Every structure is written in C-alpha cells, then in structure tokens.
Amino acid sequence: MGYDAARNYRLQAAEFASPVGVIVQAYEQIIRALQEAARAADRGKFEHKTNETNRALAIVSHLEAMLDHEVGPNVANKLEVFYETMRYQIVKASAERTGERLREVSDYFVPLRDAWRVVEKEHPTPPGAPAPPRRPTPPLTPIDFPADQVLSNWSA
C-alpha cells in the first residue's frame, strides 16, 4: 500500500472513530512515528528522523492541548505532566545519533494506548450516537523547556 493510500485509510478511520478511538489512534501514531524515527536514526537518515520526531511531538502537543481540566482534573493534570515529560524526552532522544532512546520513549506510550483500547472495548460508543462536541483545535506553539534543558545544537 502506498503512502497516500495508507494516509487516506488512516484519515478515514479517524473520521469514523469514536472519541476514544481517536485517542487510541493518536497514541498509535506517536508510537509509529517514534519507531520510524529510531529506524531512520539507525540508518543515518537524520532529516527523516527529525520529520518523524516532529510529527510525534505535534501529536503529543495536540493531545495535551485537548485535555479538559474541568471534566477530569486529576487525570488531566497527570496526563499533562506525562505529556510535558514525554515532549522533553523525545527532544532529548532525538539529539542522539542512534535510535535506542527513541525506541525507549515510544515504549512509554504503549501502556496508555492499551489502557485506552480497554476503555474503548468496555464502553463503546453506541451506533448512531452523536459525537461529543469538538473543542476547537488550539494552534501548535513552540515547546517551552527550562533554559538549562534547551538543546543548543540541533545538528545531526
């Protein structure tokens, strides 16, 4: 299956997925992007590694921006800390020349993806049920890191 066909399939799957299914797909995309970035790093394809790493970072940032602190403040706060930590770890791992750390970071997302799969299975959206209202997608913003943790040299 070509890239465009696979992309179209994923877009169509996301369009018809339940809200929980969309979260599962987001985690799958993060894991896939980090694994691909790791393979690219191992092959010395640093531009591809950077593109895949940026893709993972964008998805993590989007998930964080969509957290609803009013509905579930405890869970939202914990996920926010997790996402912030993972963004930092992704950037740190991306600075390395091998894919080992990127693979390790991708492994942190697997238990969350699997937990959301259980939620999706145990509490499916009934057929024909209206989707919950979508919150507007916030614009992606640069990631803020403490000054002592900023990577000053991004050369591969």
What are these regions (language model features)?
Residues Y9-A13, Q29-R32, A38-R39, A58, ...:
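Soluble N-terminal interaction domains of secretory/endomembrane membrane proteins
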Residues F16-H48:
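N-terminal first-folded block
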Residues A26-A33, E52-I59, F82-T85, Q89, ...:
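Amphipathic, well-ordered alpha-helical segments in soluble domains
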Residues I90-S106:
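Amphipathic, charged alpha-helical scaffolds that flank and support histidine-based chemistry
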Residues K49, A56, R101-V105:
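Solenoid-repeat scaffolds in large eukaryotic assemblies
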Residues M1-F16, S106-A156:
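Short terminal interaction segments
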Residues H62-N77:
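Short, solvent-exposed, charged loop/turn and helix-capping segments
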